[in-house]
Structures are given as C-alpha cells and as structure tokens.
Design a protein with these regions (language model features):
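Conserved phosphate-binding loops in nucleotide/dinucleotide-binding enzymes
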Residues: 1, 15-31, 64-66, 88, ...
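Catalytic adenosine-cofactor/nucleotide-binding cores of aminoacyl-tRNA synthetases and other
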Residues: 1-62, 160-164
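Non-catalytic, well-ordered alpha-helical scaffold segments
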Residues: 1-5, 26-41, 92-99, 103, ...
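An acidic- and aromatic-residue-enriched active-site/binding cleft used to recognize and process polar
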Residues: 8-12, 23, 91, 99, ...
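Core structural elements
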Residues: 8-10, 31-44, 50, 65-78, ...
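Short, charged/polar, low-complexity loop and linker segments
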Residues: 11-19, 77-89, 120, 175
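Conserved short loop/turn motifs at secondary-structure junctions
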Residues: 21-25, 98-99, 122-129
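Acidic, turn-prone loop/beta-hairpin segments
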Residues: 50-80, 111-190
Length: 190
C-alpha cells in the first residue's frame, strides 16, 4: 500500500518522469498510512476499555458536537470530490483529497476530541465521539479501497459487523450525502 500510494501521488500517474526514492516511501508511510492506522488503534483501544459496542443503536446517535458535524461534513465533501475525479478518470486528483483528509482526521478531529474519549463517565458526548469516529473510519475504508486495498480492508475487517460483507472490496463505493454537509461550519473550521 505504501508503494501504491506513493506512486498514485507522484508525477508517474500523469505520465511524467519519477525519481523513485525509498525516502518517499518512508514519508508516505509516516505521514499518511501510520496516522490512519493509529486512528483505528485509538478507536479500538478506547472502545474496548469502555466496553463500547458499535451496534446500530449506538451508531444512530445525533451529532450535536460541532467537531463531529465538521468531520462528517468533510467526509461527505471528500466522497463527492473523489467520486467526481474518478468519474473523470483523473486518478492523480482522486488521491490528493483523501491524503489531506487523513491529516484532518488525525491531526484535527482526534487531537481536538481526545478529552471526550478520555472522560470517565459514559455520557452522550463520549458515545457520540465513538459513533462519529467509527462511522468516519468505516466509510473512509470503503472510499480508499481502490487506492490502498490492504490497509482499507484491515480497517474494514476491524470495524465490520457480522451482517456486513466479508471484505471492503465487496462493499459498494460510498455515496456523498449532501444533507450531512455543513458548508458554513466547514468554512469556519478552515
């Protein structure tokens, strides 16, 4: 997946020359793949400690927290962007938005929401944080499956229910839901 993402994010996709370096692979792994995997580990670890189960009842929580609404809005913006670029067969421009989303998810959403996960009490805010991070990672795994298939399937396998398909590669590509977009909130957060 590191090689695949490195190459998809390189001039080679546009038919230009590429000077392949191991340093580029290390940077791709360090800046994109490890933070994404660490987001999954973060969710899994704290959900297990708190005994949180991603049952349909627990996932139907309303997003009252602005951070939750923001990351869900950004996810659906991302889905629309990637779908648009893929429809235009522009592979290079399909990858760039989700690479940026990994940074938003890990360096903004999770870092700004950590205290919500660390609370001792199982209040609604904590449950909303779990549900939001779960849904975002689950849907994101479907979005990135064509690009980084192994990590996306690892995320999917960790989060899936028995009623879900056996692999992310058997799932439908996610569709953007414009009703979950909050453009005003996105602009204020940017």
């Amino acid at each position: 997946d590191a090689v695949r993402l490195y190459m998809l994010n390189s001039p080679a996709v546009r038919g230009e020359d590429l000077r392949f370096t191991e340093k580029g692979l290390v940077e791709t792994t360090r800046q994109q793949l490890l933070p994404l995997w660490n987001a999954l580990v973060f969710l899994s670890t704290y959900a297990k400690i708190d005994g949180w189960d991603p049952s349909p009842v627990n996932l139907s929580v309303k997003n009252n927290n602005p951070m939750d609404r923001w990351i869900v809005s950004r996810l659906h913006k991302l889905i629309a962007e990637v779908q648009n670029e893929m429809d235009g067969y522009d592979l290079n421009r399909s990858v760039a938005p989700f690479v940026g989303f990994i940074d938003l998810l890990t360096n903004w959403y999770i870092r700004r929401s950590r205290r919500r996960f660390w609370k001792a009490a199982q209040g609604p805010d904590k449950l909303e944080a779990y549900a939001t991070l779960y849904i975002v990672l689950f849907e994101f795994s479907k979005l990135i499956a064509p690009f980084i298939p192994y990590i996306s399937d690892g995320i999917f396998q960790t989060l899936r229910h028995d009623s879900d398909h056996e692999s992310v590669h058997l799932e439908l590509f996610p569709e953007a839901d414009s009703t979950l977009r909050d453009i005003d909130l996105e602009n204020r957060m940017d």
